[in-house]
Amino acid sequence: MATLQESEVKVDGEQKLSKNELKRRLKAEKKLAEKEAKQKELSEKQLNQTASAPNHTADNGVGAEEETLDPNQYYKIRSQAVQQLKVTGEDPYPHKFHVDISLTQFIQEYSHLQPGDHLTDVTLKVAGRIHAKRASGGKLIFYDLRGEGVKLQVMANSRNYKSEEEFVHINNKLRRGDIIGVEGNPGKTKKGELSIIPQEITLLSPCLHMLPHLHFGLKDKETRYRQRYLDLILNDFVRQKFIVRSKIITYIRSFLDELGFLEIETPMMNIIPGGAVAKPFITYHNELDMNLYMRIAPELYHKMLVVGGIDRVYEIGRQFRNEGIDLTHNPEFTTCEFYMAYADYHDLMEITEKMLSGMVKSITGSYKITYHPDGPEGQAYEVDFTPPFRRISMVEELEKALGVKLPETSLFETEETRKILDDICVAKAVECPPPRTTARLLDKLVGEFLEVTCISPTFICDHPQIMSPLAKWHRSKEGLTERFELFVMKKEICNAYTELNDPVRQRQLFEEQAKAKAAGDDEAMFIDENFCTALEYGLPPTAGWGMGIDRLTMFLTDSNNIKEVLLFPAMKPEDKKETAATTETPESTEASPSV
């Protein structure tokens, strides 16, 4: 048992250490020195092997010793090996390799082969990335070749090469992560593994970095999002998510094209940021010597085109909002918006039900999907896209949820109503950052008491006019508009309304928005004189609709983070502390029909 009288040793004339502590430190230093010596010896061994042509067969290691190096050492050795190939006249980056058949097609075409089959009369060329390399004795090497989301085994046998030296030379220079081309015959091993049996393997592009093993995978989210290429190499489920995203966009295009809509493109930089209540990004145009705003929504341009006689238009593209980043928000995001002359919001509800229910059935095979809002380990929810979707009236349902009678909707623009809503938020502990306008207070209450009830698709309808400066007034309920938002799993994915086409009323609402902006609401709209002038030429009865592609993709891929469905999400620089993922973002109280 150690005692306080344990003898001490002075180190560098300063700190006093016990003999046990000194012994521990000396042992640790010795162990570190041995490790460094071993790595140095291994590095020199690999460099020597690189500098001279190998004259022995590959052993079971097949470069496995290199896997024990730290990443920097591995990169150095691999880079020098590739440079040596260039010196000896071997091009590690050839211009072209003709591929006869994809890996997927190869598997479909030859999976019927029997164990032990070898089609020597069929020669094909395939290509892919090496994910595993393993030797069986000195004359047989297996590779796992991956690409297109599938795996094909390469069974390299020395007897199929011109000489054993050629077999050794070709296979000794290949490592995990390399992209190779393989020319050979289809076959199956005795155990029934479909393989291509090569006559020749060509290095097409070496991987200079140590590739993580598939067994362990790439799980660190920071690395996955910043190095999406590596994420795609190692995680096939990521590839599948973006395939689903592509299918969603393809389905929407096909659906709208069949309804006679024309796909259009509108400016992404604007003098005035219109079409939604949101904070814009500002850029500068050198030639024009003026600030421009990245678009927050394309709505106003679309309605101008309807004025011009293009009755059905749609656009799938990026929007930019200078707001926070969280699990469901990214500063740039993708929407689909369409505008349909001679239609109202009732028509668009039917179109929305038909589009989304058909899409979900087409992509997943069922109207019902399972979603985990808190991640794979969290609670699972069943989301049912079977039409018709649930519909609720915003103000009526809010009164039921709050257990209070709100002022008449015709009085929602008064200070008295604002004060009542303010008091309710205080009493219900609902946070609303300033400015505490009627529209913002209503939006927070709806989020707290109505949106949380929307698991399966639910239309929240008939928003107050004060929340919807671009929507047409309700034909039978004063103070309300003909607008709906579609919520799924408590999140808005669609926004639509019968469009306001009275130029006088539109100008009045723009002026009210200008007052809100002057009062400190930096998300309020600007007055767009060009749009008001266009309305004066006559906008036919029109309905407009917008949907967030990113959020819909989250639901259909069971992803609870928007970064999972964006190939290259917004990230803070690595030298800054990453806090963006936890930032709370106020939901926009109105929108173009965009999310």
Curated annotation (Swiss-Prot):
Tell me, in one coarse class, where this protein mainly resides.
cytoplasm
Q: Which cysteines are joined by disulfide bonds?
A: none
Q: Which residues carry this modification: N-acetylalanine?
A: A2
Q: Where is the composition biased (Low complexity)?
A: 580-595
Q: Give residue numbers for the modification (N6-acetyllysine).
A: K86, K139
Q: Which GO terms describe its biological process?
A: diadenosine tetraphosphate biosynthetic process; lysyl-tRNA aminoacylation
One GO MF term on file is: ATP:ADP adenylyltransferase activity
Gene3D superfamilies documented for this protein: Bira Bifunctional Protein, Domain 2, Nucleic acid-binding proteins
- Positions annotated to bind ATP: R321, N322, E323, H329, N330, E492, I493, G548, I549, D550, R551
Feature: compositional bias, Basic and acidic residues: 7-44
Q: Which residues carry this modification: Phosphoserine?
A: S205, S393, S588, S592, S594
EC number(s) in its UniProt entry?
2.7.7.-, 6.1.1.6
Q: How is it modified after translation?
A: Phosphorylated on a serine residue after mast cell stimulation with immunoglobulin E (IgE).
Note whether Nucleus occurs among the keywords.
Answer: yes
List of residues binding substrate: G275, E299, E337, Y339, N495, E499
Residue numbers of Phosphothreonine PTMs: T589
In this record, what's one Pfam family? tRNA-synt_2
Task: Name the family the entry cites.
Answer: Belongs to the class-II aminoacyl-tRNA synthetase family.
The UniProt entry, under HAMAP family, shows: Lys_tRNA_synth_class2
Written domain comment of the UniProt record: The N-terminal domain (1-65) is a functional tRNA-binding domain and is involved in the interaction with DARS, but has a repulsive role in the binding to EEF1A1. A central domain (208-259) is involved in homodimerization. The C-terminal domain (452-597) is not required for interaction with AIMP2.
Q: What does this protein do?
A: Catalyzes the specific attachment of an amino acid to its cognate tRNA in a 2 step reaction: the amino acid (AA) is first activated by ATP to form AA-AMP and then transferred to the acceptor end of the tRNA. When secreted, acts as a signaling molecule that induces immune response through the activation of monocyte/macrophages. Catalyzes the synthesis of the signaling molecule diadenosine tetraphosphate (Ap4A), and thereby mediates disruption of the complex between HINT1 and MITF and the concomitant activation of MITF transcriptional activity.
The subunit field of the Swiss-Prot or TrEMBL record says: Homodimer. Part of the multisynthetase complex (MSC), a multisubunit complex that groups tRNA ligases for Arg (RARS), Asp (DARS), Gln (QARS), Ile (IARS), Leu (LARS), Lys (KARS), Met (MARS) the bifunctional ligase for Glu and Pro (EPRS) and the auxiliary subunits AIMP1/p43, AIMP2/p38 and EEF1E1/p18. Interacts with AIMP2 (via N-terminus) and MITF. Interacts with TARSL2.
Q: What is this protein called?
A: Lysine--tRNA ligase
Q: Which organism is it from?
A: Mus musculus
Q: What is the lineage of its organism?
A: Eukaryota, Metazoa, Chordata, Craniata, Vertebrata
